[in-house]
């Protein structure tokens, strides 16, 4: 079977570049995002499947992996790309917004990694990458 990648938190920034790179290397691409309607162009460009997923919701993540299992089996690579930008100085950041950002970047990453690792360990193969989304490569991060 062809090598495959699941990109969680897909959009038109860093994850789009990664999707194109993986496609160019012959990998089957699956894109996951809260709003898959925004992925129409990327889906077409990469021949990807898309799955709706809120990475901070246990049931949504479990559903993502059940659907991924049916489409590509256990992915060779899972990329966790969601982020939530806060901006501003630490003294000005709303604590509720900070909690939301931590939920997306940390807890969501844990949920995705847990589901991916369970499958990858059984197959004795696979990699999980965590990005900082596009914010990690721009000056405002």
Predicted regions and their residues:
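Conserved glycine-rich cofactor-binding loop
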Residues: 11-12
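Catalytic Tyr-X3-Lys loop
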Residues: 84, 91-111, 129
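Rossmann-fold cofactor-recognition segment
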Residues: 45-59
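A short helix-coil junction within the Rossmann-fold of NAD(P)-dependent oxidoreductases
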Residues: 25, 71-72, 88-89, 115-124
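Conserved NAD(P)H cofactor-binding loop of Rossmann-fold oxidoreductase domains
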Residues: 79-87
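Hydrophobic positions on the long internal alpha-helix
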Residues: 64, 79, 108, 112-116
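Catalytic loop of short-chain dehydrogenase/reductase
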Residues: 127-141
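Conserved glycine-rich Rossmann-like NAD(P)H-binding loop of the short-chain dehydrogenase/reductase
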Residues: 27-40
